[in-house]
């Protein structure tokens, strides 16, 4: 599995509408359901020495499932281990790309480092691609001082940054200095009846950096506009900084 290939599939996708399923909880990877028990192999997290990712619990429960709808041949799902609807709550999920034939092609584990609420239109435009800088630029840096300022784990910061003041991530899609970020609609269900959930528009771009240990660390930046929660209209705009590592199909077991 090449962590670059999903981004390339999205970038190369033909324009057009993604067919809308009546139920997101259908034909899911690993036959997962809300409430399923998930077991994670710890090896990918141990191999990712120097990462900012906090090693997750080995056994967890799928608390929500979403699908991101956008022009692409396959389907992109997220199996949420924690929803993180509140900024103070951890958000984590396993992102799964399935081919048009229904085969699992790529998996990544992500957890949220930071959620910020843009206060001005200028701030917001940096994470939507409208200003043609910020999100979509070929490189994105995380600064140690900023991460320490939000109270991020000091041990992880020291291991990841070492003597450096910044970590530089490269956009997963090569090419021009700036590429317009991807846009999707995320439909999340929080229970088997579908009576609880979330609907939001997502503008995102994936980045990556090579670790000295030989692994890779993934950075997913997303500007999200919440439209509905539990079938009630809601308007909230925030930007999520998600850090992650690639997984293989054998790293995930669901019952």
Protein language model features and the residues they cover:
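Mixed-charge, low-complexity intrinsically disordered regions
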Residues: 1-58, 65-255
């Amino acid at each position: 599995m090449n962590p670059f290939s999903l981004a390339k599939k999205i970038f190369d996708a033909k324009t057009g509408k993604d067919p809308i399923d009546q139920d997101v909880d259908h034909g899911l990877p690993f036959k997962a359901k809300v409430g399923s028990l998930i077991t994670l192999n710890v090896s990918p997290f141990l191999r990712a020495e120097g990462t900012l990712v906090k090693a997750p619990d080995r056994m967890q429960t799928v608390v929500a499932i979403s699908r991101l709808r956008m022009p692409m041949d396959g389907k992109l799902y997220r199996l949420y281990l924690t929803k993180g609807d509140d900024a103070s709550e951890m958000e984590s999920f396993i992102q799964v790309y399935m081919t048009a034939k229904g085969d699992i092609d790529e998996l990544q584990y992500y957890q949220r480092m930071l959620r910020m609420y843009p206060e001005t239109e200028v701030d917001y435009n940096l994470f939507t691609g409208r200003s043609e800088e910020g999100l979509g630029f070929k490189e994105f840096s995380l600064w140690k001082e900023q991460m320490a300022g939000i109270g991020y784990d000091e041990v992880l910061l020291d291991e990841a940054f070492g003597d450096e003041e910044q970590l530089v991530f490269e956009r997963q899609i090569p090419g021009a200095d700036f590429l317009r970020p991807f846009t999707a609609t995320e439909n999340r269900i929080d229970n088997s009846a579908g009576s609880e959930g979330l609907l939001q528009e997502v503008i995102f771009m994936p980045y990556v950096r090579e670790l000295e240990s030989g692994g890779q660390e993934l950075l997913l930046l997303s500007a999200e506009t919440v439209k509905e929660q539990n079938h009630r209209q809601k308007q909230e705009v925030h930007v999520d900084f998600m850090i992650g590592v690639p997984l293989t199909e054998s790293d995930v077991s669901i019952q």
